[in-house]
Amino acid sequence: MNNKLTQHPDNAMLVEFSAGTLPTAASICVSAHLHFCQKCRAELLRLDQVGSQLMTEAEPADVDDSLFDSVMAKIEKAEAAPPENIDQKSDNGFPFSVNRLLNNPAHRPIWKRMSGSVDVARFKTGQTDYEVALHRICAGGKTPKHDHQGTEYTLSLIHI
């Protein structure tokens, strides 16, 4: 797999990723990028440390007593649920976040032909403003004519 990176997430995006507030679709792209980029992993670690320090120094907030019971109920419910059986040991060279999409038995990708050289699989994120779509493009293939409305993040994973 070719891992020459030409673009990187900006610091604002890495801060949101670190805080867990980045939308799912963008998080998948950032996670996949981090798989290949030592520079961005180092910056994320630094941001995580800053966030940790801020949390340590923050004044404790008053919380309703029922919140603890609610959190514990969610934890117990999650423990009772069977673990997802996702093949994490795939040796295809793809990042974990991409393998998680490709190998989830509950949501196997449905590939649809876009053109003679492009197939696409779309995934629901639960967010109406974002979409995750994986494209398989044959060597030498060209993407169909399309527009770029809104914000788009593209991560190209190239097998050579």
Task: For each feature predicted by the language model, list its residue ranges.
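Conserved short histidine dyad/triad with adjacent acidic residue
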Residues: A133-H148
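Iron-sulfur (Fe-S) cluster-binding segments and ferredoxin-like electron-carrier domains
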Residues: L44-S52
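A short, N-terminal "cap"/entry segment at the start of jelly-roll beta-barrel domains
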Residues: E79-Q127
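Conserved hydrophobic/aromatic beta-strand scaffold that supports enzyme active sites
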Residues: V120-R122, V132-R136, Y153
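A short, acidic loop/turn at secondary-structure junctions
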Residues: G51-A73, A81-I86
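Short, amphipathic alpha-helical interaction patch
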Residues: M1-R41, Q53-E57
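Conserved small/polar residues in nucleotide/adenosyl-binding loops
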Residues: H159-I160
